[in-house]
């Protein structure tokens, strides 16, 4: 789960981690495709254990096909603390990180839980699940209203105060739920997936769980504890509990395994799916835009190579769909984009403060076959600007204490951690694998589907995608 811990500066650092893959245990019982987690407490057992588990590569249906998770431990252990109630309000880590929903949550899944429980499932708690912690939840009708943002966009309310040392002050609040103030802004954010964590360079959207001179393992341990004390309203975890949760999480790799049009994503030499992903090397700074942190090699914009084997495929049906995926991958790697107005790039001294940077999608999504930024590099791509505000989002007016400049934003982002004016609206770029399972997209759930994501970038950066290019990009994103 995301935490409400407030702290930390980001840093660029090297952190290599090794992985070993163990063989899968024998599966004794079959599990039906598409069942929710509560019906997937598998009674299959390896020879050496009586613990229930989910088998590796169990497919879960999603709108684009199906995804699966591979654990380097051989199976997904449902007795881990990740699946235990460690707080006081009934929540568990998997309340907001469900394998059938890409280890996040979706509006569809949340609406199903609401219908089954009348809005009393542990995910529906006022401390951060409701639009306001003061919301009326006395009746089913009241709960449906109170949890409207969670139900419609799959967003959790994160409460963070304006830092005491901030370069700015809050001078106006427009909160449709009547709660937010300088003491606690209401920030509606999507829970990040608790899988593929070996590719992380930054923990949390705003990096508040990324600590200077520490490993990602340390950061995740602190995040797990913050989640229990915050979201689950419990006591601090023991060191052993933290370690077991992090060990469980960092063994997980999730990716799409089947596309409704292209078919199996390992067919004809393709390298889709979580098993291939688990063998992908990573370290902090790999293929960084300013040069690889270990080898010093220049940045390679060809970040994705999963579907290279499908280049040149022709035909109809699944072969035609595979050709579209390969074209989309190439577009992601090579389509020229004139990047402008992006804080963290165009106002970044390391780039020379250029008005325009000629790049591609991979300028920001540079981690090979994962797609996040391989170093801590939060960016403001305009998602929190006032002209993108919807009526269900709070709006904050901030004023620079030195210059008097004002800015309206729905979420100050990284600035609430650092206090820096230039960090307003900056967020990390997430890992791009397993996307099809966990719409909506962006930190605030503002893009309901892949079409909305591509349309946003096309409009925001003036890319000028053709209709065919948009379709090919979407075909590629669906298969990740």
Where are each of the predicted segments found?
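Enrichment for repetitive, rod-forming helical segments
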Residues: 17-20, 31-33, 372, 477
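N-terminal secretory signal peptides that target proteins for export/translocation
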Residues: 1-24
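Residue-level detector of transmembrane insertion/anchoring sites
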Residues: 14-16, 35, 79
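Bacterial N-terminal signal peptides
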Residues: 28-40
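Intrinsically disordered, low-complexity segments enriched in glycine/proline and serine/threonine
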Residues: 12-13, 27-29, 283, 472-473
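N-terminal leader/targeting signatures
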Residues: 25-28, 120
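Short, intrinsically disordered, low-complexity terminal segments
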Residues: 5, 41-44
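Periplasmic c-type cytochrome electron-transfer domains
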Residues: 45-480
